[in-house]
Swiss-Prot record:
Keywords: ADP-ribosylation, Cell projection, Coiled coil, Cytoplasm, mRNA processing, mRNA splicing, mRNA transport, Nonsense-mediated mRNA decay, Nucleus, Phosphoprotein, RNA-binding, Spliceosome, Stress response, Translation regulation, Transport, Ubl conjugation
Annotated motif Nuclear localization signal 1, positions: 204-210
Region (Necessary for RNA-binding, interaction with MAGOH and localization in nucleus speckles): 137-283
Motif Nuclear localization signal 2 mapped to chain: 254-262
Purpose: Required for pre-mRNA splicing as component of the spliceosome. Core component of the splicing-dependent multiprotein exon junction complex (EJC) deposited at splice junctions on mRNAs. The EJC is a dynamic structure consisting of core proteins and several peripheral nuclear and cytoplasmic associated factors that join the complex only transiently either during EJC assembly or during subsequent mRNA metabolism.
Name of the protein in its database record: Protein CASC3
Modified residues (Phosphoserine): S35, S117, S148, S265, S363, S373, S477
Organism for this UniProt entry: Bos taurus (Bovine)
Keyword Ubl conjugation in annotation: yes
Assembly description: Identified in the spliceosome C complex. Component of the mRNA splicing-dependent exon junction complex (EJC), which contains at least CASC3, EIF4A3, MAGOH, NXF1 and RBM8A/Y14. Identified in a complex composed of the EJC core, UPF3B and UPF2. The EJC core can also interact with UPF3A (in vitro). Forms homooligomers. Interacts with STAU in an RNA-dependent manner. Interacts with DHX34; the interaction is RNA-independent.
């Protein structure tokens, strides 16, 4: 538009200047354009005839100068027929293109003159020449003139307008080079292939030449039937280093299999590991008859060196180990063979962790390691020794192992006030009872040194009974609990052991009696209810239901009172803490435990859901252990666990380095307990409950 305006302005100046010269020379009709412009510029002073002549001149000028590019003058002259030029012109011009230049021309001559003077002066001569020229030249000139009609070009032939306008200027929507172009034929989208079948067919013809070669391009990935045929074992071994197809051949896949158990995955791989585990258990344990107990022992002895650490880990990781130990104990009982192997693997795995945990509870750890490794080492012997110990001890050990698994499930399940009472010692045995384990009764004293020594002093006949049980249970419960608890903490070990070792557990449980009846295979919780109606089953329930930690707590309580098995969990999980509360709580809780037998079962229900109950139970166990150590009454003492609730705080807080109570050495798992607390695991679910969004909402509301 700016170009058009400039062109128009230049034409106007040319016309007007030529018109002015014409008026000066006499305003001849030939120069009517000049006279017209002069009259208009003068405010209509020119005569009518002169105006008409000016009109004719204007028409001629329009043709000469370019029909489309009429000057403002011409338009004025045209519109003037006897009407005052200014008024008509101003209206006409405003209707024209609303071009400021034309409007100014129509309104005042001064503005016109100014604009014209601004235009090229050279146009004067050209304008004069053009006037003299004929119409034919108009077309040539018109090409450079306005291309869009504004209503003033009606006199010009439409042909010229269209002919010149079309080729000259394309609307934005018609110009293919313009982004605003609107396609009106064919496809509307450049890549729309719906109607381009022909083009597509044509294109390939042009593409016949290949710029690259495909030969050998897929050699690395070609399908070769000969390669798809099954490979021979030799080929597989050559390729992979072992027969990848023998899923059930442990020798071929030994490394992998071993790794998995270490990580506590054996439960899932029990079927494949069943063969291997028994072998390992045999390696560690010896007679197959004692395999189930030994299996547990293996857990204890599996990582003999590590085992001490595992036990410590149980104690150090009291709660975690409690859970792990709890179910694994059951699993251990059930898994005699399988679980044993798994336990071994997991034992080594946990022993690693436990080795770490020793740092957590150095003094307990040292004791635990000292006691634990011997116990582990001797747990295997002890299982064989149960026969030497006495016929009952052998079953007792299995029973106690079961009892321990019970202890995991139901600490009280030890079934067994006596067992539980002696069981208190087993945890230390877990720490260092193993050596005594080889000897049924003597091991008991040895264990007693750790756990049962007081028991011996406290309970003469019971202690021997429990001592045997302790030996058995200590072997399986202390060491195994640590692993089992650890495993259960990990979650996989418990289930694995439970899945793998349910039958063995039943063996132990059978030995234990009612305990054997419980399905220790799956959730310890299931077996909690099943656990013997007596407090011990409740204990198991508490321990199992609550956390594995509660089991540990309960285990310790029962350990003191009921049997060594429960205590190992305590020792593993809460032993240190228990030790502190135990000595302190013993006196205080001794009376309470008896009144609280009923309470003990309630804690069971509570403990499953709450870590605090575990602590309460654990304290109860502490006090109960003291009482239990004195005698079988530990059952009531186990209930006494409820009164010990405060002790939980005491024992965690007290964190006595290690105390020997009733012949039971209590280590300070308070530190370990804090670390292994299963609360964190539960907290993991809690975060779901505690959802961060609510805090966000609160912050939003506050903000």
């Amino acid at each position: 538009m700016a170009d058009r305006r400039r062109q128009r302005a230049s034409q106007d100046t040319e016309d007007e200047e030529s018109g002015a010269s014409g008026s000066d020379s006499g305003g001849s009709p030939a120069r009517g354009g000049g006279s017209c412009s002069g009259s208009v510029g003068g405010g209509g002073s020119g005569s009518l005839p002169s105006q008409r002549g000016g009109r004719a001149g204007a028409l001629h000028l329009r043709r000469v100068e370019s029909g489309g590019a009429k000057s403002a003058e011409e338009s004025e002259c045209e519109s003037e027929d006897g009407i005052e030029g200014d008024a008509v012109l101003s209206d006409y011009e405003s209707a024209e293109d609303s071009e400021g230049d034309d409007g100014e021309y129509s309104e005042e001559e001064n503005s016109k003159v100014e604009l014209k003077s601004e235009a090229n002066d050279a146009a004067n001569s050209s304008a004069k020449d053009e006037k003299g020229e004929e119409k034919p030249d108009t077309k040539g000139t018109v090409t450079g003139e306005r291309q869009s009609g504004d209503g003033q070009e009606s006199t010009e032939p439409v042909e010229n307008k269209v002919g010149k306008k079309g080729p000259k200027h394309l609307d934005d929507d018609e110009d293919r080079k313009n982004p605003a172009y609107i396609p009106r034929k064919g496809l509307f989208f450049e890549h729309d292939l719906r109607g381009q079948t022909q083009e597509e067919e044509v294109r390939p013809k042009g593409r016949q030449r290949k710029l690259w070669k495909d030969e050998g391009r897929w050699e690395h990935d070609k399908f070769r039937e000969d390669e798809q045929a099954p490979k021979s074992r030799q080929e597989l071994i050559a390729l992979y280093g072992y027969d990848i197809r023998s899923a059930h051949n442990p020798d071929d896949i030994k490394p992998r299999r071993i790794r998995k158990p270490r990580f506590g995955s054996p439960p899932q791989r029990d079927p494949s590991w069943i063969g291997e585990r028994p072998n390992k258990s045999h390696r560690h344990q010896g007679p197959g008859g004692t395999l189930p107990p030994r299996t547990f022992i293996n857990r204890n002895a599996a990582g003999t060196g590590r085992m001490s650490a595992p036990r410590n880990y149980s104690r150090s990781g009291g709660f975690k180990e409690g859970r792990t130990g709890f179910r694994p104990a059951e699993a251990g009982g059930q898994h005699a063979g399988r679980s044993g192997e798994t336990v071994k693997h997991e034992t080594s795995y946990r022993s690693r962790h436990l080795e770490q945990t020793p740092v957590r509870d150095p003094s307990p750890e040292a004791d635990a390691q000292v006691l634990g490794s011997p116990e582990k080492e001797e747990v295997a012997p002890e299982i064989p020794n149960p026969a030497p110990d006495t016929a009952p001890p052998v079953p007792d050990r299995p029973v106690e192992k079961k009892s321990y698994s019970r202890a995991r499930r139901t600490r009280i399940k030890a079934g067994d006030a006596g067992k539980v009472a002696e069981e208190v010692p087993p945890p230390p045995e877990g720490l260092t009872p193993a050596p005594p384990v080889p000897e049924a009764t003597p091991p008991t004293p040895a264990k007693t040194g750790n756990w049962e020594a007081p028991v011996d002093s406290t309970t003469g006949g019971l202690e021997q009974d429990v001592a045997q049980l302790n030996i058995t249970e200590q072997n399986w419960s202390p060491g195994q609990p640590a692993f089992l608890q650890s495993r259960e903490l990990r979650g996989m070990p418990n289930h694995i052991h439970m899945g793998a070792g349910p039958p063995p557990q039943f063996n132990r449980m059978e030995e234990m009696g009612v305990q054997g009846g419980r399905a220790k295979r799956y959730s310890s919780q299931r077996q909690r209810p099943v656990p013997e109606p007596p407090a011990p089953p409740v204990h198991i329930s508490i321990m199992e239901g609550h956390y594995y930690d509660p089991l540990q707590f309960q285990g310790p309580i029962y350990t003191h009172g009921d049997s060594p098995a429960p205590l190992p969990p305590q020792g593993m999980i809460v032993q240190p803490e228990m030790h502190l509360p135990h000595p302190g709580l013993h006196p205080h809780q001794t009376p309470a435990p008896l009144p609280n037998p009923g309470l003990y079962p309630p804690p069971v229900s509570m403990s499953p859901g709450q870590p605090p109950p575990q602590q309460l139970l654990a304290p109860t166990y502490f006090s109960a252990p003291g009482v239990m150590n004195f005698g079988n009454p530990s059952y009531p003492y186990a209930p006494g666990a409820l009164p010990p609730p405060p002790p939980p705080h005491l024992y965690p807080n007290t964190q006595a380095p290690s105390q020997v109570y009733g012949g039971v050495t209590y280590y300070n798992p308070a530190q370990q307990q804090v670390q292994p607390k299963p609360s964190p695991p539960r907290r993991t679910p809690q975060p779901v409950t505690i959802k961060p969004p609510p805090p966000e909402v609160v912050s939003r509301g506050s903000s």
